[in-house]
Design a protein with these regions (language model features):
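Glycine-rich loop(s) and the adjacent beta-strand/alpha-helix scaffold that form part
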Residues: 5-15, 20-25, 106, 205-206, ...
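Loop/turn elements at helix/coil->beta-strand transitions in domains of secreted/extracellular proteins
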Residues: 9-14, 100, 192-196, 226-227, ...
């Protein structure tokens, strides 16, 4: 986003350094192009895993390593952040400029909507509100069963009143996931004489002298000088670069003999959405067409929700048959907790830029998160009892019908919880009165001139929606103020 916007000014010279490969816009390979292939492949992934933590097991953490980043491997959902998230950030983190009303203009400037998915028509990011006829048979039945369970139909997930069930707003066209390397950095933009893209190049650290960023050191030792540095390496990589640059918690830096440039709580507020899948057998003839794999959602409040926040996303997906069910097919109904209270952390154990960071998601460390995920399983079971799902499903395979009380469901969470792959807040933003912030509303790193961070790592806490599209909005707003 920033390379696209900033290079539109011919007086600027922009160098975009990409760790992965910069494919031409129309030649991305299938794992980072096809909508039905979510999560990428080893060639286009950073290969990160979480620490075992409370779960007692390591989770695979998919992050896109290609021009376009994780927008090239994600589910391509394009939703606006709800108003109560913005209200929380303005109050709790002294971020008046991040209010809901002001943010709507930046969403509109992004959106190129052909239907009712948003109210922007001339933006740079194509989005599309799926109709019932465009989702899979399974997702249509999910919508019908949720309505039968008493949930309302959403008036639109991008509206001010997004709660309810319905099809997603997507950043896809004709089965193609439209990542930012395609949409923002098309052929015409890449041809700008003031924009250079250097791919398959890893940044080691930012060089800082006398409190001012001077350039970056690459993993091979080469140095590139610049008037301003903007890190957009993502929630797991941007904080690692900062720490190797001497910006972070003093105990981490001293332990690695890294000179301290600015002592800041980098990596101390990692958040992600925990997701609990339930597995069901289903009659094979009832599966229908499984495409697209992501199509509809119920957004609702758990029984333990607070502050008027809708904290549960419920959805469904088909799984390949493993031959273990008599019904012939299996599918998922899953609940994601989108207002978690648990907080994780990220740190580094080495100065080696090729070493993966140490990532502790912190899942289930808050007892209230456990209760709300159990609420999610109960919502799922209620939906599964309704028509048309009731005639389609066979046995509940996991956590299983034998786990019928809340205590047994709670006990099973550690073996089942996964990441919804929406990590944020390792370099959190905040206003002058927010002592826990690392950057300000424009991504400026505290105590270091000419250095910004602009990516999902700077959200004050994890938004209540899929994070890619809102992060584009955040970058759009910062770019506008840089103009």
């Amino acid at each position: 986003m920033l390379a696209y916007r900033l290079s539109a000014d011919p007086s600027r010279r922009v160098l975009l350094i990409e760790a992965g490969k910069a494919y031409p816009p129309n030649t991305y390979p299938d794992p980072v192009r096809r909508q039905d292939l979510v999560g990428g492949d080893p060639q286009h992934d950073w290969g990160f895993y979480s620490e075992p933590g409370v779960l007692g097991r390591r989770l695979q953490l998919n992050r896109g390593k290609v021009l376009g980043g994780s927008s090239a491997i994600n589910g391509a959902v394009a939703m606006r952040v709800p108003k109560y998230d913005h209200d929380r950030w303005t109050k709790a983190h002294d971020l008046d400029a991040l209010n809901w009303q002001s943010s709507q203009a930046f969403y509109r400037s992004l959106e190129r909507t052909s239907g009712t998915g948003g109210d922007g028509r001339d933006g740079c990011v194509p989005i599309h509100q799926l109709g019932d006829e465009e989702v899979s048979d399974q997702h249509r039945d999910f919508i019908a069963s949720a309505l039968a369970a008493g949930y309302q139909r959403t008036s639109g997930f991008t509206t001010g009143q997004p709660l309810g069930v319905g099809p997603y707003v997507m950043n896809t066209r004709m089965g193609v996931r439209l990542n930012t390397g395609m949409t923002l950095l098309g052929d015409a933009v890449r041809a700008r004489p003031n924009l250079t893209i250097r791919d398959e190049t890893l940044v080691d650290a930012v060089l800082v002298e006398h409190g001012q960023a001077q350039g970056v050191r690459l993993a091979g030792g080469a140095i590139i000088l610049a008037g301003e540095i903007i890190l957009s390496a993502g929630t797991y990589v941007s904080p690692a670069i900062l720490m190797r640059s001497g910006i972070g918690p003093s105990e981490v830096l001293r332990g690695l003999d890294i000179p301290i440039v600015s002592e800041l709580p980098v990596g101390r507020r990692l958040q992600d959405h925990p997701m609990v899948p339930t597995v069901w057998s289903i009659r094979k003839e009832a599966v229908g067409l499984p495409y697209p794999p992501i199509g509809a959602m119920l957004w609702t409040a758990s029984n333990h929700a607070t502050n008027g926040e809708a904290d549960l996303n419920i959805s469904t997906a088909t799984l390949p048959d493993d031959g273990q069910t008599s019904d012939g097919a299996i599918f998922l109904l899953f609940a994601a907790l989108v207002r978690p209270r648990s907080v994780g952390s990220l740190t580094i154990a080495s100065r080696d830029p090729y070493a993966a960071p140490i990532i502790d998601l912190g899942f289930l460390t808050d007892s209230g998160d456990r209760e709300r995920l159990v609420d999610g399983v109960e919502v799922i079971r209620n939906i599964a009892r309704q028509q048309p799902f009731a005639d389609m499903v066979g046995a509940e395979l996991a956590p299983g019908a034998a786990k019928s009380d809340r205590a047994s469901i709670n006990a099973a969470l550690a073996t089942s919880v996964q990441s919804y792959q929406h990590p944020t807040s390792t370099v959190p933003m905040g206003g002058p009165r927010d002592a826990g912030a690392v950057v300000d509303i424009d991504g400026h790193v505290r105590g270091v001139k000419s250095l910004r961070v602009v990516d999902a790592s700077i959200w004050p806490d994890v938004p209540s929606v899929a994070t890619a599209f809102p992060t584009m909005m955040l970058a759009e707003s910062i770019a506008a103020r840089m103009a």
